[in-house]
């Protein structure tokens, strides 16, 4: 309801909506979202900070139209979410990190990669500093993918 992305969308006159997932089975939630997306005649679904795994039925129904951003250079640290990924990067001693924008498939974080953005992991970096750097890259990566998508749609 109060997600920053919804506020930003409204600020740019982009139609957006919220569907509460609490106390709903995944399939029920996904059907409700799918219905709303069809009503809005949506062409592209962006998963930004979406901390849920979509059902196979939803992914199949919207195949080729769902894009996710993952806070690592996939396939490294696949399956992790948010700060856990940055902890894994530090624990592994990775020299670089970044983000991956990919098409969503039934297999989590295994869809075709559309864009990867990289940044160095510096001595003294923390989970917080990596999160900040990677989130900046995520925004850049999404813009790049959306612009490319628009060109291909025309």
PLM regions and their residue ranges:
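One-carbon transfer enzymes
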Residues: 1-154
